[in-house]
Amino acid sequence: AKKYLAKTKGSNIFIGSVHNRRAFPGASPYAATKGALETLTKVLAAELGSKKIRVNCVVPGGVFTEINQRAGLFDDDAAKKRLEDMASIHALGRIGTPMEIAEAIEYLICAEWTTGAVLEVDGGLGLGLTNA
């Protein structure tokens, strides 16, 4: 992929996670791998910049996706309560949509002067608010 990206002066965008900023018990393997993506973003941006290849990372907060819905993760009352609790720890009071993440990715694809960036698109989840 490096040869193609160099030829096209392309862009590589990783998807990280707020699990690298907030501790969610039981998510250690997921958090570790997503955290590694942020470091990889910066290292690859430094290594590939001279070839005009941009490398960035988007860090979403909670996002309601079709995969969640198809898996039935929000079908029962307990699941609906989890969804409400998740929304309450975002500063904007709701979880995000796939389109909002796509818009951030679109920005990074077009932003020719941006590389090595870790863009938090998390509705304020990374601020550390609680639902007390």
Feature-to-residue mapping (PLM):
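A short helix-coil junction within the Rossmann-fold of NAD(P)-dependent oxidoreductases
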Residues: 1-9, 111
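Alpha-helical segment proximal to the catalytic Tyr-Lys
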Residues: 3, 46-50
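Short, flexible catalytic-loop segment of classical short-chain dehydrogenase/reductase
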Residues: 21, 59-71
